[in-house]
Design a protein with these regions (language model features):
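Conserved ABC transporter NBD signature motif
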Residues: 51-59
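Helix-to-loop junction immediately C-terminal to a conserved catalytic motif
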Residues: 43
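ABC ATPase NBD coupling module
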Residues: 60-76
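ABC-type ATPase nucleotide-binding domains, specifically the catalytic core motifs of the NBD
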Residues: 95-108, 118-121
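Conserved catalytic loops of ABC-family nucleotide-binding domains
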Residues: 171, 176-198
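Conserved catalytic motifs of ABC-family nucleotide-binding domains
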Residues: 81-92, 100-104
């Protein structure tokens, strides 16, 4: 599903890994700059200097941009800071991709979103009340939850988590770890790739494989 073949870009040198259907993996970083570089490669925003990046068996950069975008409709991304549109309310941010790409209405999204929030325990009620706020009025945790729910509504085959648990209190990080684990198991063959700082919080994240990128 995701394959790197001796990929080189800046400080990332000769990186190779292969994630098959159903895999979970975490990549640990010693610097956010290195993480941002790899995220750009995974998102198709940066072209490698050498090597190949394949999604679903297709070389990303052997395709024109339109074809590459079609591949990424099967890929979800949860940006570290939420990646929310500043002048749209949280609920509007959450719904926009599912409405645009899947034709999902607010009424149709209500049940799956409620199921996602149900896994968040005591914070669920407060989060629901906050869905009418703009992103700038939300906490980091709340922005991450909105970004998670937005990606999950698309039911992607691959989901890439960008420092999703970094900077959160232990209990909040643990809640999101449980949520992503449950979501991974909901669809046969789904791949979950976590980009993580090399710290104690990330050490608690269960994954089939771990890759460490450090100097």
């Amino acid at each position: 599903m995701i394959r790197f073949e001796r990929v080189t870009k800046g400080p990332v040198r000769n990186l190779s890994f292969d994630l098959d259907r159903g895999a979970t993996a975490k990549i640990l970083f010693d610097s956010e700059d290195r993480k941002n570089l790899l995220f750009g490669l995974l998102a198709g925003l940066q072209r490698p200097e050498a090597g190949r990046i394949l999604f679903f068996g297709e070389d990303l950069f052997a395709h024109e941009e339109d074809e590459r975008l079609a591949l990424f409709r099967r890929v979800g991304v949860v940006p570290a800071h939420g990646g929310l549109i500043s002048n749209l309310k949280a609920w509007e941010n959450l719904l926009l991709p599912a409405w645009y790409h899947r034709g999902l209405t607010a009424e149709q999204a209500e049940r799956p979103v409620a199921e996602i929030f149900d896994h968040l325990g005591p914070s669920e009620a407060g989060l629901k009340r906050r869905m009418g706020e703009l992103p700038g009025q939300l906490s980091l945790y709340e922005r991450r939850v909105v970004a998670l729910a937005r990606a999950m509504l698309m039911e992607p085959d691959i989901l890439i988590y960008d420092f999703t648990f970094a900077g959160l209190e232990r209990d909040a990080a643990q809640q999101l770890m449980k949520l992503t684990g449950k979501f991974h198991g909901r669809k046969a063959g789904r791949v979950s790739l976590y980009l993580c700082p090399d710290d104690a919080v990330s050490a608690r994240l269960a994954a089939d494989s771990t890759i460490t990128l450090a100097h």
